[in-house]
């Protein structure tokens, strides 16, 4: 059995070693819940990686947004290149859920755009969990949403052996039942093709395809190959092909599911008719009977997930199968930034329920649609075998549950938590201007946090009027634009960023050495102890880090934040003195999800492809074919690196080449 093998040039330092040992010992001893309370920049991810190697358990890591999940995924791929590191997030590029707004009598149909590469990565995660134990899955709260039954997904797989006798026609039917499509012209993910005595299958969860060679009905050769270049990668004696979708239904489950749906429809129609809701009853009857017919004939219907409970033979109210059900019982969970992630998990069910309740009440869906849902918080907690909560500011639930809380407050870089000063609100604008000017002289940046949009706008106008380069970030700014603004701040395109909540990015800003917190003494979640400590941590990447709290009194949250920050500074200073470390600002390349190296590759690829594409009309068919192969390889490389927007650009170029050549 393959073991987790951590590969890194670094060794644990500071208090990482103590944290790794304490938490690993706790896991081995059977402790259910523990907390790693680690400051910003202390190397919490590296500590997590060392724990995984020490305990050798299949691991799920949950983050609270896709951006941070992608960062963690890349880091763990680097730490464990010989093991299965997978990525499981929502596969929707765009998602408008089905909904009904009674006040406006407005029904909104479900509308979604699925990201093909993320769909592959999700399937790859469950495939790895079925086939091996050395698996790390990095996920968002997508892991608490309903997924197909793991038993069905596993039991429906096709096992193919060299020397086996099987009719090609029979194998074709088996693949179609697993929701693979036949396409003899183009071999793409989730498809297969047959040419003479050769069948090629492109599993929905892989980047490579399989080629089966037959001698009459005997399989004489099984090979894996690159579907773009055609290069043979490996020969096999046997292999398994898993379904192309997570939601699959064994044939023998269909009759029972249909009976349950029909019975529920009859019961629900009786209720609606008794209540005098004749329009709702007729609407529900028409919609559901159409779905029943589709399920009966095709084994599928639009919105099939709304019938997941009868299909899976679940009782009303029973939790759905989720990614957790694909893990073995002894799995380990890390909840990153748990002070945000834990409450987020708890909020998912209620939001989903309120939307679907309207659909049921007004005759758009059967009550079983309510069981196509995320896990409730108590169901989620029951699913956890052993968990480590990771945060600089763990919440009350983590602290209450944990049998041990392990601190990690020493930064190997020697950087100290910033100095905190308090300044009265009177004259705060002038004081901020003076502090920002000092930072500009040092080629450093500033963050200013306000409580209201009006204050942010006024401060932006004031500082801009004094000749400073300022930008204001607000809730209506899209995620991609937010990342671009943060990159601009780091690159020095402007000097000051003003906003209400600048915590949610989770992106390092080592150039920021000054943070001004307006209305620091106000009561509320934006000025709680947790929020203030997180804000202060933003300036902990710079050797000149300084935070000024503008307030007319010292609130309890301010007092606790200052005391905790001073405690951490003292520990770090003692460590630095003992080891002769002089703190230096972290030097980090300016990047978002993409590294600059990848940007250069992208620019080079587009520059190289551009002239060819522009002169397509003079290219002969052979040259066009070569160009398409080259572009497909580039597209696959971007997708590999989670550079989905760049992959989409190349995909569009490929379509352009094919269109002109047709």
Swiss-Prot record:
Disulphide bond pairs: none
Which residues does the UniProt record annotate as the domain UVR?
A: 625-660
- Motif Beta-hairpin, residue numbers: 91-114
GO molecular function list: ATP binding; ATP hydrolysis activity; DNA binding; excinuclease ABC activity
Cite the Helicase ATP-binding domain residue spans from the record.
25-411
Q: Which GO terms describe its biological process?
A: nucleotide-excision repair; SOS response
* Cellular location(s): Cytoplasm
Q: Name one GO cellular component term.
A: excinuclease repair complex
Q: Which Pfam families match?
A: Helicase_C, ResIII, UVR, UvrB, UvrB_inter
Key words, A-Z: ATP-binding, Cytoplasm, DNA damage, DNA excision, DNA repair, Excision nuclease, Nucleotide-binding, SOS response
Q: Binding residues for ATP, per the UniProt record?
A: 38-45
Predominantly, its location class is: cytoplasm
* Domain Helicase C-terminal: from-to ranges: 428-594
Q: List, alphabetically, the PROSITE patterns matched.
A: HELICASE_ATP_BIND_1 (PS51192), HELICASE_CTER (PS51194), UVR (PS50151)
Task performed by this protein: The UvrABC repair system catalyzes the recognition and processing of DNA lesions. A damage recognition complex composed of 2 UvrA and 2 UvrB subunits scans DNA for abnormalities. Upon binding of the UvrA(2)B(2) complex to a putative damaged site, the DNA wraps around one UvrB monomer. DNA wrap is dependent on ATP binding by UvrB and probably causes local melting of the DNA helix, facilitating insertion of UvrB beta-hairpin between the DNA strands. Then UvrB probes one DNA strand for the presence of a lesion.
The record, for NCBIfam families, names:
PRK05298.1, uvrb
Q: Which HAMAP family match?
A: UvrB
Assembly and interaction partners: Forms a heterotetramer with UvrA during the search for lesions. Interacts with UvrC in an incision complex.
Annotated domain remarks: The beta-hairpin motif is involved in DNA binding.
What family does this belong to? Belongs to the UvrB family.
Q: What is this protein called?
A: UvrABC system protein B
Ranked from the top, the taxonomy reads: Bacteria, Pseudomonadati, Spirochaetota, Spirochaetia, Spirochaetales
């Amino acid at each position: 059995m393959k073991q987790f093998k951590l590969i890194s040039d670094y060794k644990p330092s500071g208090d990482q070693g103590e944290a790794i040992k304490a938490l690993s010992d706790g896991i081995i001893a059977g402790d259910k819940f523990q907390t790693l309370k680690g400051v910003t920049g202390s190397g919490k991810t590296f500590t997590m990686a060392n724990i995984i190697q020490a305990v050798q358990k299949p691991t799920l890591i949950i983050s609270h947004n896709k951006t941070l999940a992608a960062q963690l995924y890349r880091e763990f791929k680097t730490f464990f290149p010989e093991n299965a590191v997978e990525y499981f997030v929502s596969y929707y590029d765009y998602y408008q859920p089905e909904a009904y707004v009674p006040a406006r009598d407005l029904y909104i149909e479900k509308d979604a755009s699925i990201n093909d590469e993320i769909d592959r990565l999700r399937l790859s995660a469950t495939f790895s969990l079925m086939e091996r134990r050395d698996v790390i899955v990095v996920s968002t709260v997508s892991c608490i949403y309903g997924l197909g039954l793991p038993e069905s997904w596993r039991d429906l797989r096709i096992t193919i052996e060299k020397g086996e006798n099987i009719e090609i026609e029979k194998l074709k039917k088996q693949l179609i039942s697993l929701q693979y499509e036949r396409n003899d012209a183009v071999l793409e993910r989730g498809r297969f093709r047959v040419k003479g005595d050769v069948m090629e299958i492109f599993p929905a969860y892989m980047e490579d395809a399989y080629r089966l060679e037959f001698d009459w009905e005997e399989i004489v050769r099984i090979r894996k190959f690159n579907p773009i270049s055609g290069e043979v990668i490996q020969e096999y004696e046997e292999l398994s092909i898993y379904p192309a979708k997570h939601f699959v239904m064994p044939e023998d489950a269909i009759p029972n599911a249909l009976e349950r749906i029909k019975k529920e429809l009859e019961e629900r129609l009786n209720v609606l008719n008794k209540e005098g809701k004749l329009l709702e009853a007729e609407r529900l009857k028409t919609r559901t009977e159409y779905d029943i017919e589709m399920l009966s004939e095709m084994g599928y219907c639009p919105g099939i997930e709304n019938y997941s409970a009868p299909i899976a033979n679940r009782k009303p109210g029973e939790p759905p199968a989720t990614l957790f059900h694909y893990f073995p019982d002894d799995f380990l969970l890390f909840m990153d930034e748990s002070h945000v992630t834990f409450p987020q998990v708890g909020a998912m069910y209620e939001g989903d329920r309120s939307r679907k309740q309207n659909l049921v009440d007004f005759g758009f869906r059967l009550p079983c649609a309510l069981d196509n849902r995320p896990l409730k918080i108590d169901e989620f907690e029951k699913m956890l075998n052993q968990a480590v909560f990771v945060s600089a500011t763990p919440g009350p639930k983590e602290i209450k549950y944990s049998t041990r809380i392990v601190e990690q407050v020493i930064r190997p870089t020697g950087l100290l938590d910033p100095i905190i000063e308090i300044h009265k609100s009177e004259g705060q604008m002038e004081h901020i201007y003076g502090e920002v000017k000092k930072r500009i002289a040092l080629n450093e940046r500033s963050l200013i946090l306000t409580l209201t949009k009006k204050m942010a706008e006024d401060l932006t106008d004031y500082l801009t009027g004094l000749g400073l380069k300022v930008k204001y970030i607000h809730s209506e700014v899209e995620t991609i634009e937010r990342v671009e603004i943060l990159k601009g701040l780091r690159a020095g395109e402007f000097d000051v960023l003003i906003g209400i909540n600048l915590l949610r990015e989770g992106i390092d800003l080592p150039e920021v050495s000054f943070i001004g917190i307006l209305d620091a003494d106000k009561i509320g979640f934006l000025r709680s102890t947790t929020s203030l400590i997180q804000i202060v941590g933003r300036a902990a990447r710079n050797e000149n880090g300084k935070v000024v709290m503008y307030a007319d009194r010292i609130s309890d949250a301010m007092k606790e934040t200052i005391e905790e920050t001073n405690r951490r500074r003292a520990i770090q200073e003692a460590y630095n003195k003992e080891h002769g470390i002089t703190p230096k600002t972290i030097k980090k390349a300016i990047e978002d999800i993409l590294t600059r190296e990848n940007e250069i590759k992208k620019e080079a690829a587009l520059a190289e492809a551009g002239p060819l594409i522009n002169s397509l009309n003079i290219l002969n068919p052979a040259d066009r074919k070569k160009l398409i192969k080259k572009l497909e390889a580039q597209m696959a490389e971007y997708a590999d690196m989670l550079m989905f927007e760049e992959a989409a650009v190349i995909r569009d170029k490929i379509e352009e080449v094919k269109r002109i050549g047709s």
